[in-house]
Amino acid sequence: MTSTVPSHASQRATPAPVADGVAVRMRGASAVVGGMTVWSDMSLDVAAGEFVAVLGPNGCGKSTLLKVLLGLTPSHGMVEVLGERPGRRTKRIGYLPQRRTFDASVRIRGIDVVSLGLDGARWGTPVPWLNRLLAPRRFAERQRRLDHVIEVVGAADYARRPIGRCSGGEQQRLLIAQALIRRPELLLLDEPLESLDVPSQAGISALVRDICRRDRVAVVMVAHDVNPILPYLDRVIYIARGSAVIGTPEEVITADKLSALYGIPIEVLHDRAGRLFVVGQPDAAPAHTAGAGG
């Protein structure tokens, strides 16, 4: 099986100086699902303002890593998220689960979907006119925050349109705005580029990079295809066969590293355009451009 990864080493953005804070710290960590260990002995730090991708074949435990950080999946070893055990700082985490689409018949406006990031933990349905009447100052602050995140993701032109009438890329921008609404310090994205066209993938990738750099948000993104985000990444976590290799893309996506990880010979080839071809991955566990899973 062959997959392609363009080489963008010379184009990669220089990371902004990292603050002292560490958003994620893991030491000898392992994930357990249904009594089975999915991966083990993972050690890493993700700092504020760092953009990290999680790569690997179907079922290797990519999404499981995000669930461990959210406290939704049991783990062993040391795992700290924003200085606490997983599950203790969820209001400071923005989470976008695997892509969901909205049918064309869905009439709820995009801005109302974004506002669920504020109201989703509360009982009942938000009633804007009642909130404006009973708590005008809070309502005004809420509206300013909504307008701000919608502007940040570039969705102002269509935020008040029914979300079912928005394109896939527009819907995804609105969902990212929902994940940002509470000013998270850590953003966990589970395959946000899945099923998007190439221009939308490029736009979302650049948007996430900008949020990461400008707001010092640590980003951990599970990637179905590393190509669109490769110019922006600081590091990758490549998971296969229960183990992980962590480093810059140039350090990790090599024949030696991937061969050792998969336990079989893997080749990494270059074409005239500077693109990389990863060759020899098992058909049951393709990397980079394979389907999402685990």
Q: What does each model-found stretch correspond to?
A:
Residues 24, 38-41:
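Conserved structural motif at the start of ABC-family nucleotide-binding domains
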Residues 77-91:
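Conserved ABC transporter NBD signature motif
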Residues 127-158:
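Conserved ABC ATPase "signature" region
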Residues 162-166:
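Conserved ABC ATPase signature
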Residues 183:
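Conserved catalytic motifs of ABC-family nucleotide-binding domains
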Residues 187-191:
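Catalytic Walker B motif of ABC-type/P-loop ATPase nucleotide-binding domains
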Residues 255, 261-294:
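ABC ATPase nucleotide-binding domains
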